[in-house]
A protein has these predicted regions:
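Switch/coupling segment of Walker-type NTPase motor domains
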Residues: 1-91
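Non-catalytic, charge-rich alpha-helical accessory subdomains
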Residues: 77, 82, 86-142
Length: 142
């Protein structure tokens, strides 16, 4: 039986070097491209959230996976991006129907906030949740 594997491949080099070999050995290859979703297979990691740890892993993987190899960045900004993503995920799970609980909806919320002068819209939306809701706790840290 073949196992399942997930690789972070920001430049696509691992895919280019190994996809043919893996396919020839019976593996089903899927590509999750968050930068260019048109060139991506469908997968919704938010559909599989069962715990706070799942939210942590998804947010960490998305933020850390977008750094280019050898690129430097200030850990502060990575931490802020991760906390914002966690807040958005928790908000979507609490408020939106299952078909809208996805990373595209997270990106849509950030775009809407950017187009309307910053985080006021996000603050209003998340502020409607109970005070101790995880979305509020992560958002107030951003």
């Amino acid at each position: 039986m073949l196992g399942s594997y997930i690789f972070t491949d920001p430049k696509g080099e691992l895919y280019d070097d190994t996809a043919g070999y893996l396919k020839s050995h019976g593996y089903d290859i899927k590509v999750l491209n968050l930068v260019n979703p048109v060139n991506s297979d469908g997968y919704n990691p938010l559909a599989h959230i069962n715990s706070e740890l799942d939210v942590d892993v998804i947010a960490n993987t998305v933020v850390k996976g977008q750094k280019s190899e050898g690129g430097s960045s200030d850990p502060y900004w990575d931490d802020m991006a991760e906390m914002l993503l966690k807040a958005l995920i928790y908000y979507l799970i609490a408020v939106r129907p299952p078909e809208e609980q996805n990373l595209a909806s997270c990106a849509e919320m950030v775009r809407a906030a950017s187009n309307n002068g910053g985080g006021n819209i996000l603050s209003e939306m998340i502020g409607q949740l109970p005070y101790d809701h995880p979305a509020r706790m992560y958002y107030k840290s951003v």
